Regions:
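P-loop NTPase motor domains
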Residues: 362-373, 378-387
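Inter-motif core of Ras-like GTPase G domains
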Residues: 382-426
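Generic beta-strand/beta-sheet core signal
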Residues: 67, 374-376, 425
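Conserved glycine(s) of the Walker
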Residues: 72-74
């Protein structure tokens, strides 16, 4: 079985057309049109997101997802489904034979071992010379959702901070429920200090609608109450209108209200968001073998995993702040834009966060005939921490990236309808 008949679906043109329609409202004086403008723009933004997703997903083979807490069970299932007779899963990249289990897949420890979805497929993207492995990556909107996920799943929002009469959740609801607060909040964002000037921004109005939908679903605050904060309400409408006009500091301020302006989470957004800007909004990049192999120039028989963790190793995220200014801890990647190969440099820890899927090509004799296998990171139960712990400067905030990313990944693939059959490992 080859790629399905939806390869040339032209849904990208639907998305592009909808994007061109939105500015049309600016020149229309008709009162009836203007009254419906906001809701129509939201619907168009939703259609853009859905069309872009369908354009990406429809051409892909039927997918079998493998998900669950059992790492050993998942590895066995993946090996059975994707290999030939239980053989080792190997592939050739830039003329070098690499083993998935021996050279790429991390060894589990006391937390989730992997933080990326692996697609085992017979569709072989040869990549770029020197950068043979294709990796799909998060964008800024995904980063916001990861932080929303962790803030609402990993923290005790019902706790009452010292010296306060209200718990964190009640205080947040009181703040965002104030018309005066929101008015002043957006007036400040419209000031010149937050205006987009020489910087680049790759987040769009339709991304805000996607974030709004996610916040409605995940937030424990009133942001999760569709009656109080529907996607066409004042708050989300102002965010949607402003987002493409804001510099990075402005976007950090705007999105921080979604996690009640918790400094630790805003710092995570700031550090990773700046790194994501280096990828210029790309949905995928090509990476070199040294993202997995300690010395790709060694003899194949001497290949071994990167000593500080491979791109699949979610434990690498603990180095997000440690490695940001160390050029030795950076990696060069390639973005392909309109046929042009553009090299970019990003910290390896940040790339490990950004990476959401990488493709491992299967041999023709593989058991996966006619379908792809998606190996998801192992899931773990979530625990709720006290927000007071952030007063300790030694608190490792990167663990919330780990928890949020693993939790968000599976939701993302479900939302995008990228899983046709799910095998649950217990």
């Amino acid at each position: 079985m080859t790629l399905n008949t939806f390869t040339n679906n032209h849904l990208n043109e639907v998305a592009s057309t909808c994007q061109k329609v939105i500015p049309w409202f600016e020149g229309i004086d008709d009162k009836n049109v203007q009254e419906k403008r906001n809701s129509l723009e939201v619907k168009l933004c939703s259609l853009i997101e859905e069309a872009k997703t369908a354009y990406d997903v429809l051409p892909v083979k039927t997918t079998v997802g493998v998900f669950g807490a059992s790492q050993a069970g998942k590895s066995y299932l993946v090996s059975t489904l994707a290999s030939f007779g239980g053989d080792d899963l190997t592939a050739t990249f830039d003329g070098k034979k690499v083993s998935f289990f021996n050279h790429m897949n991390p060894i589990g420890g006391d937390f989730e071992a992997t933080g990326i979805v692996t697609r085992f497929t017979k569709f072989d993207d040869k990549g770029v010379s020197g950068f043979p492995i294709k990796v799909k990556v998060f964008n800024e909107a995904d980063l916001v959702k990861v932080l929303i996920n962790s803030y609402n799943s990993d923290l005790n929002l019902k706790a009452v901070p010292a010296g306060s009469q209200s718990d964190y959740l009640s205080a947040q609801n009181q703040k965002i429920g104030s018309t005066e607060f929101l008015k002043n909040f957006f007036e400040d964002l419209k000031s010149d200090k937050y205006a987009l000037k020489d910087e680049k921004s790759y987040i769009r109005d339709y991304d805000v609608v996607s974030i709004a939908k996610y916040a409605i679903r995940k937030s424990k605050s009133d942001f999760g109450d569709n009656a109080k904060f529907p996607i066409d309400c004042y708050f989300w409408s102002e965010c949607r209108k402003l987002v493409s006009k804001l510099n990075f500091a402005g976007r950090a301020k705007m999105f921080s209200i979604l996690w009640n302006e918790l400094d630790a989470f805003t710092t995570l957004f700031t550090e990773l968001g700046k790194q994501l800007l280096e990828l210029e909004g790309a949905s995928s990049v090509y990476v070199p073998l040294n993202c997995f192999i300690e010395d790709p120039n060694a003899n194949e028989n001497d290949f071994r995993r990167r000593e500080d963790g491979t791109l699949l190793d979610i434990g690498v995220l603990k180095n997000v702040f440690k490695d940001k200014d160390d050029p030795c801890k950076s990696v060069e990647v390639v973005i392909v834009n309109d046929g042009n190969e553009i090299k970019k440099t990003i910290s390896f820890a940040s790339l490990t966060f950004a990476a959401r899927e990488f493709s491992f090509p299967l041999p023709k004799e593989s058991n996966a005939d006619g379908f792809d296998v998606l190996d998801f990171p192992g899931c773990r139960s979530r625990k709720t921490d006290e927000i007071e712990k952030f007063k300790d400067p030694n608190t490792d905030t990167t663990e919330y990236l780990r928890r949020g990313k693993v939790g968000y990944l599976f939701e993302l693939y479900c939302d995008r309808h990228e899983i046709d059959v799910l095998l649950w490992c217990v």
